[in-house]
Amino acid sequence: DLVLHSVTKYLAGHSDVILGALVTPPTDAGRALRERLEQHRLLHGAIAGPMETWLALRGLRTLHLRVERATATAGQLASRLGSHPAVGRVRYPGFGAIVAIEVAGGAEAAERVAAACRLWTHSTSLGGVESQVERRRRHPAEPATVPEGLLRLSVGIEDVEDLWRDLDRALRA
């Protein structure tokens, strides 16, 4: 097996590096694959620069703290959003820092909520220290199975009460 990690997201965690990592298993086949990948990298120059690797290492040092904080905050927000009158549905598996909500009122209401957020960055990315909101169905390429009013919330490490006040205010706007 070969595992591809997006170091850009949670591993680096500060939205300031674009990097990936390939991980091979500690087996004979895995070692053979790794040797082939290293040869390809050597011939084609696909290596990360020193600044990118330093930024990734910096992020790895705080990964456990960031994930712990963001996960706890996401759980609290998901619980509160479940009883909010402007939210039709909350999608949260009970772990992790991604919460999806369906805003009552569909696409226009979801756009208004996203635009009204002040602490939440309106962005497609995820896994950073800053909280981000995105309406997933904005782009024509999104499948019709994605609800029109769906907002994806990538929860960062800000104070839960600050994030809640901002979301609540935006949902009531």
Feature map (PLM): residue ranges:
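PLP-dependent enzyme catalytic core of the Aspartate aminotransferase-like
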Residues: 66, 131-173
